[in-house]
Amino acid sequence: MDNDLLWIRKIITSCDNFSEDIDLVQVTAGPFGPIIDRIRERLSFLGEPRRSPKAHNFTLYYRFESEFPPMRPLHLKVETNTREHFIIGTQVKVPFSVNSKWFTESCEINTYSLEELLGTKLRALYQRRKGRDLYDLFIAMTLHPELDKNLLIRCYRKYMEISVEKPPERQEYISNLEDKMANAEFLGDTIALLPPDAQYNPVNAYNLILNELISVI
């Protein structure tokens, strides 16, 4: 599947927020059936998933129990974007490893450049009311000051253009985010996702993203 799928999100930005999702993108045009069969084969130890095919994505939902007491139900969502068959920046490989008493292995994972990942995240920040998008952008910008912001904005514009008929102007984006910053649900979105000792202030994140990115849209 190396040539067909790219991974997105937290494994690249080193964000420490918890997620029960695996997010993939099918970057080669063609039938998705063989790819989903391969994913199911690799995850067969989780049991048979519930499938949810849609026009532009295909999602597998797995439900299983934890392996140590107290036993509790867990779930995993594997969602693949089957629409955006292109890459703006450079495809990169990053190291990924698992080291636990159950399983130890390492590999390289295909993904987008960090700028392209964050371009899609900047789109998500406008389109949905989830404070985790602001958090992810803030952490990535803080950890990687060397980012090519021009490339990030170029990626944002491309992804926004294929998502909406009329991309927002700068002031529209600012007004959109100001409304969200006054929304308790948006501000509280990261509470259950971050470790208790996480030092995060959404107002600081808002100011950074506004000044560094949104101001140049």
Model-inferred region functions:
Residues 1-11:
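Short gly/ser-rich loop at a beta-strand->alpha-helix junction or flexible surface loop bordering the NTP-binding
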Residues 12-16, 22, 27-217:
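Structured mid-to-C-terminal alpha-helical surface segments
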